[in-house]
């Protein structure tokens, strides 16, 4: 009888304690929700940017045109070197970003994924997912809408020479940017064709116009082609851009929380969000308001103190006396004050990347974050080998001291976090900004089994596998 009473007493005690703890958790959870909601409101984050695309385009998506762009995206007919496509570097296996630390363009082995081989370019390929909302493009911001709005060409669309401002008549920055990749020697064009950019484009068009299947597809969305007009590069650019417009993946847990679903995020993710928008200071560069379009970038160029790595085999010319540096924005402006500056990376779907920073010098998000919180301290200990980079990237690193001397003032003092705070911030970055529609298994169907040219489609490695050294 006594043991029964003891059991009953213990049970009652457990119930009381559970009730007390549960009641205490309600205010804590509610306070966390209220704090995060207030912070998002202050930063003008609505979680609704994905719904604004058609309004800003002034029309609905043209699905036929987007599908044409998809076929072009994966067809090597658009590259004069005959071995790479847009999809070879902007891969659906990684959220339409790179599969590599530093991109591999021409002279590749026909594989897109961890086993891709070939000479390296200079930087990691940025994602095109959500790029419809980016006011400038590329790590050195070399393609930009001068109005700060990619949907507004009224102030001009700025490109390096020889294009300059000549593409400003096109309706969106992405339509204009589509004129460039076919002309990039190290990406798809190769070095055998001797003509200039216009001549390269003319040759791509000659190829497309010679394929009846492409003329039929273009004719379905451009009636003038159906009646005999040749395919032109405006049409090509519109098709590529329309496919990119379809790649909007901006419905992450944080978006759903902002729209009212308080259960969309875990408590650690919410605490991490408060750090991101608050004491950790991340939002000062990875901003969401105004022309940032909730993309987690101010789209400005900064010196982040990134370690300098260069591949053993490259088809690019690296900077510096030892050809192991990347001068970044200076390449475009010619101003030494812009040396080592790179555009703040948009952070949506960050966890789908296999590597981080402009040169993929980190293969693990937690290491990239730890470094970024205190570059001066962690630069002393950086080693490519510790990041499991491919063996062709394990050579001596470029000089770091001149990079640190130019470090953005916001990064000079470092940001101290407790281990728990670090884990919370990492959880926010890894999980709260990820739209599950961008996961590889949900994008696999976008790779066509065949393309109108009849050429073989590159081999995409959708199954996650361990990185192999070269």
Residue ranges and their predicted role:
Residues 1-3:
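N-terminal secretory signal peptides that target proteins for export/translocation
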Residues 5-6, 17-470:
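Periplasmic c-type cytochrome electron-transfer domains
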